[in-house]
Amino acid sequence: AFGTTFDSIPYPRPYLSAESVRLIWWRERLGRKTKPRVGLVWQGNSNHSKDQYRSVKFDTIAPHLLPDFDWYSLQFDISEQDEKLIDQIRNLTHFGKTIGDFSETAALCKLMDRVVCVDTSIAHLAGAIGCNVDLMLCNSADARWHASGDKSPWYSRMQIHRKNRGEDWSPFFKRVVESIRQIELSNL
């Protein structure tokens, strides 16, 4: 065994960056900021063996998208049902296939005040570029996130929110959003 502990893992500074040309393009596309911007990822790859545990149905979290924020879907593909629901939410923007690759996603993440996501590659991307990340985990999360604790040894600006065993996603997401609201209000 390596004898690795939390204290021996270097707490990394951002080690990836978004391309400046993409940052400029997305900044213009987003326009003037009037509220805190929150990127949102609720679903991972549906072919992942644990997707049923780590992804959440959009209609479960939609009622909790507070008007205090401008929400931005960082999802690439979404269902027709989700698209119809998104169209009804004024403070949520979905770019869809305009997000062509991870360099686009990185630029968008960097322009957010926070990124709220389930356990997907976007959580790692946002963490690696130094974003404020709120990671939502089910109670049987991947081992890299450890069994307890609210900090990540891999990303210094990541806050881990752990769903209790048997807890529904709706009250859990509501709790996460309220915690984000408190943080953002204190930053005003």
Question: Locations of the language-model features?
Answer:
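Catalytic machinery of carbohydrate-active enzymes
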Residues: A1-L188
